[in-house]
């Protein structure tokens, strides 16, 4: 049948340029916990993460560039910390420290199109070796039946040990020792919720203050595009009765501006 033969023939793809690749990786994980007391536990974790390689698909460099795969990314992670409860479980204090080592880190870059094409292309390259170290502390407290408070602090050092690639113009680009984009050295947050009974339902007010240290928004760490320290305040007023909930929100009440 001619119609059937057309359908079958139309589904065949004999293109010699159809790219194929396969990646696999052993990703072990080891975790240890020790219950020091009934209310305190310490833990440690060793693990390896894996992100598969792939293809960039359509890019401005043409078919040859689009069919060249980028390699997988691996990260080795070490973390240890403590989890604890105090004052009859009304206060919870947790802390952890971690170290992450990236190998063949995949980076998404926006580059000028090559081969005479106009505009930009977005490509993924294995450009970087990187290290992240950090410390996180979290406190939760049921101060009273009506008041709940939560706070956390994060310290982060996220830096590229080696970040080199070839630009579309053929020149070498070296971003080694630059900071990760959108990775403030210091972050802090505190939020509180106060609730009470009202008119057969429940009312509550929630407010939060969030602090972000100075950070860059691009891989090049362009000073003119850096965000300075930011303090962002949010608040909401809420009322729930039966199956209905009414809320009034206020976002970024300090009117902080920044690059995204």
Language-model segments: which ranges?
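Structural signature of Gram-negative outer-membrane beta-barrels, strongest in the C-terminal barrel
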Residues: 1-101, 193
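Transmembrane beta-strands of outer-membrane beta-barrel proteins
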Residues: 2, 28, 42, 91-95, ...
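Solvent-exposed loop segments that connect transmembrane elements
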Residues: 2-24, 54-69, 107-125, 160-178, ...
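Outer-membrane beta-barrel strand-turn architecture
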Residues: 22, 26, 34-38, 74, ...
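Residues on the lipid-exposed face of transmembrane beta-strands in outer-membrane beta-barrel proteins
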Residues: 22, 30-34, 80-84, 137-141, ...
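Membrane-embedded beta-barrel scaffold of Gram-negative outer-membrane proteins
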Residues: 35, 42-43, 69-135, 142, ...
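Gram-negative outer-membrane beta-barrel transporters
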Residues: 99-101, 125-219
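C-terminal beta-signal and adjacent terminal beta-strands/loops
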Residues: 101, 199, 210-220, 238-260
């Amino acid at each position: 049948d001619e119609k059937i033969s057309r359908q079958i023939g139309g589904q065949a793809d004999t293109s010699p340029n159809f790219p194929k690749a396969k990646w696999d990786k052993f990703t072990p994980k080891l975790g240890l916990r020790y219950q020091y007391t009934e209310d305190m536990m310490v833990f440690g974790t060793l693990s390896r993460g894996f992100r598969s390689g792939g293809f960039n698909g359509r890019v401005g460099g043409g078919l040859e560039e689009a069919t060249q795969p980028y390699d997988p990314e691996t990260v080795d992670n070490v973390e240890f910390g403590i989890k604890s409860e105090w004052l009859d479980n009304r206060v919870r204090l947790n802390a952890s420290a971690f170290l992450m080592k990236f190998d063949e880190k995949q980076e998404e870059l926006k580059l000028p199109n090559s081969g005479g094409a106009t505009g930009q292309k977005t490509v993924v390259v294995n450009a970087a070796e990187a290290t992240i170290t950090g410390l996180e502390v979290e406190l939760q407290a049921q101060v009273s039946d009506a008041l709940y408070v939560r706070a956390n602090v994060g310290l982060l050092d996220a830096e590229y040990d080696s970040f080199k690639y070839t630009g579309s113009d053929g020149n070498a680009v070296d971003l080694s020792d630059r900071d990760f984009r959108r990775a403030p050295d210091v972050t802090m947050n505190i939020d509180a919720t106060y609730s009470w009974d009202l008119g057969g339902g429940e009312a509550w007010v929630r407010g939060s203050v969030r602090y972000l240290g100075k950070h860059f928004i691009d891989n090049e760490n362009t000073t003119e595009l850096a965000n300075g320290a930011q303090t962002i305040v949010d608040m909401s007023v809420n009322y729930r009765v039966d199956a209905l909930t009414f809320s009034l929100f206020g976002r970024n009440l300090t009117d902080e501006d920044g690059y995204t």
